[in-house]
Amino acid sequence: MSNKLVLVLNCGSSSLKFAIIDALTGDDQISGLAECFGLEDAKIKWKVNGVKHDASLGAFSSHREAVEFIVKDVLGAHPEIASQIQAIGHRVVHGGEKFTQSVIIDESVVQGIEDCAALAPLHNPAHLIGIRAAQASFPQLPQVAVFDTAFHQTMPEKAFIYALPYKLYRENSIRRYGMHGTSHLFISREAAKAMGKNIEDSNIICAHLGNGASVTAIKGGKSVDTSMGMTPLEGLVMGTRCGDIDPSIIHHLVDRLGYTLDEVNNLMNKQSGLLGISELTNDCRGIEEGYSEGHKGATLALEIFCYRLAKYIASYTVPLGRLDAVVFTGGIGENSDLIRAKVLNLLEIFNFEVDDERNKAARFGNQGQITTDNGTIAMVIPTNEEWVIAEDAVRLLK
């Protein structure tokens, strides 16, 4: 264990993921999840050296109580780890155009995150609560914000401007921002290493596939296009999000079918995607099980998911010009050999030849190439966003 440990916090509206990461190796010393904030059964679970623990936080507990528990109970039991923590790293979903890289948190940064809350109303307010809670519990430690959107700030205007009146961008910042940037950044580095290339000479397409999913074209280590938009709703079919649709559907739902705008927002974010199509589940494992059993809805959901993903990957060869590799990551990307094979088979024109043995081996945390040596490379690389956050925190403190 090095003396460069960072406590990484990822605050959701009703949960808090945490991990203590060695910034040199990426290893986690402690990791856990506090959840059900505001409810009677608010709880926390964590793991130290492979040993699992859990506890109640007390009815209606919040982020503050969770951070206090981490300090007093989790770290209190491991002073040898607590004494080595150098900084707190916060994942922040949306930094708008203001934050193009990670920053040390001060009051101006807090205000900037608050100013971007309209672009991520479910996420940024929760991040601010977590930042305040961490500042109260760790007043002696520097705090660093790492933004999901920052990696995509290298996109050219032709990739991020919507074909709406330009003044909406100029006056209201309506544009494509993209998400999962920290994951895409990590994957771009690791993919270049795996291919034995300098990152400046590598062109990859990264597919981060989980309940939320996005694809990014990365040229020379920089994002040049990405599938998520102003919000995480645009792009691929996801667990409960619809991804790309005809915008006039919104007017039709409101004007003809009597939906309110809030109901439409809920429908497209929480009732659509794999769940909406299959009428079964948003969990890809359940979709694959239904597919294997001949469930019509699950089969259709799986086919649409793979088809949409393959189309995006194909289109991102345009900004790259040359494709060195496609990389799958995220919960689905790292574990579903079925989806990977289906997607790559749809991309046969790009000379992908799936190696069934390699594809099945690259699951459950295993990294590796999943195509034959004769064609274009596709590989699986498990993501590690926490490591990027820890690295950035230590780098900024130098």
Curated annotation (Swiss-Prot):
ATP binds at residues 17, 208-212, 283-285, 331-335. Pathway: Metabolic intermediate biosynthesis; acetyl-CoA biosynthesis; acetyl-CoA from acetate: step 1/2. It is an enzyme of class 2 (transferase). Its main location: cytoplasm. The record marks 180, 241 as: Transition state stabilizer. It holds the Pfam family Acetate_kinase. It is found in: Cytoplasm. Its cofactor is Mg(2+); Mn(2+). It catalyses: acetate + ATP = acetyl phosphate + ADP. The active site is at 148 (proton donor/acceptor). PROSITE patterns: ACETATE_KINASE_1, ACETATE_KINASE_2. HAMAP family: Acetate_kinase. Belongs to the acetokinase family. This is Acetate kinase.
